[in-house]
């Protein structure tokens, strides 16, 4: 089966680099599915889970807190603001971040504080959703 080169990079490090049969991730206007030979595309991505279907049946999961996606016919590059390997996701930390963001929303003093708190809440909620999705998938295997 045909594959596509996939790189997921955060500001701190390269999170994933390898060949994949399929990539799914949260695009700005909805879920995107990328197969080898996909039409070139550049778009923003929302916080959420990136699923990379590699040969051999194992999927790699990476949580991204937004960023940019570039698709070329033979390559997919995800430039993430923040990226965390699926195995390194921590539900307790994500829940704590959600609570902090909700508390901050109750005490906003400016539009900038409001926007920052809303962004932090959206990221924490997306991370918790990604953890739940990953847990469901792992329970099937």
From Swiss-Prot:
<dbReference type="InterPro" id="IPR020547">
    <property type="entry name" value="ATP_synth_F1_esu_C"/>
</dbReference>
<keyword id="KW-0406">Ion transport</keyword>
<dbReference type="Pfam" id="PF02823">
    <property type="entry name" value="ATP-synt_DE_N"/>
</dbReference>
<dbReference type="InterPro" id="IPR036771">
    <property type="entry name" value="ATPsynth_dsu/esu_N"/>
</dbReference>
<keyword id="KW-0997">Cell inner membrane</keyword>
<keyword id="KW-0139">CF(1)</keyword>
<dbReference type="GO" id="GO:0005524">
    <property type="term" value="F:ATP binding"/>
</dbReference>
<keyword id="KW-1003">Cell membrane</keyword>
<keyword id="KW-0472">Membrane</keyword>
<dbReference type="Pfam" id="PF00401">
    <property type="entry name" value="ATP-synt_DE"/>
</dbReference>
<comment type="similarity">
    <text>Belongs to the ATPase epsilon chain family.</text>
</comment>
<keyword id="KW-0066">ATP synthesis</keyword>
<dbReference type="InterPro" id="IPR036794">
    <property type="entry name" value="ATP_F1_dsu/esu_C_sf"/>
</dbReference>
<keyword id="KW-0813">Transport</keyword>
<dbReference type="GO" id="GO:0005886">
    <property type="term" value="C:plasma membrane"/>
</dbReference>
<dbReference type="InterPro" id="IPR001469">
    <property type="entry name" value="ATP_synth_F1_dsu/esu"/>
</dbReference>
<keyword id="KW-0375">Hydrogen ion transport</keyword>
<dbReference type="GO" id="GO:0045259">
    <property type="term" value="C:proton-transporting ATP synthase complex"/>
</dbReference>
<comment type="function">
    <text>Produces ATP from ADP in the presence of a proton gradient across the membrane.</text>
</comment>
<dbReference type="GO" id="GO:0046933">
    <property type="term" value="F:proton-transporting ATP synthase activity, rotational mechanism"/>
</dbReference>
<dbReference type="InterPro" id="IPR020546">
    <property type="entry name" value="ATP_synth_F1_dsu/esu_N"/>
</dbReference>
<comment type="subunit">
    <text>F-type ATPases have 2 components, CF(1) - the catalytic core - and CF(0) - the membrane proton channel. CF(1) has five subunits: alpha(3), beta(3), gamma(1), delta(1), epsilon(1). CF(0) has three main subunits: a, b and c.</text>
</comment>
<protein>
    <recommendedName>
        <fullName>ATP synthase epsilon chain</fullName>
    </recommendedName>
</protein>
């Amino acid at each position: 089966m045909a594959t596509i080169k996939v790189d997921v990079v955060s500001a701190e490090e390269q999170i994933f680099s390898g060949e994949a049969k399929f990539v799914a991730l949260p695009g700005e206007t909805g879920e995107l599915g990328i197969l080898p030979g996909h039409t070139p595309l550049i778009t923003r991505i929302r916080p959420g889970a990136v699923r990379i279907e590699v040969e051999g049946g194992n999927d790699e999961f990476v949580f991204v807190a937004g960023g940019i996606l570039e698709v070329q016919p033979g390559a997919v590059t995800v430039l993430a603001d923040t990226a965390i390997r699926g195995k390194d996701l921590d539900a307790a930390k994500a829940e704590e971040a959600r609570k902090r963001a909700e508390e901050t929303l109750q005490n906003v003093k400016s539009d900038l504080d409001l926007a920052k708190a809303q962004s932090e809440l959206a990221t924490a909620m997306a991370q918790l959703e990604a953890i739940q999705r990953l847990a469901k998938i792992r329970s099937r295997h």
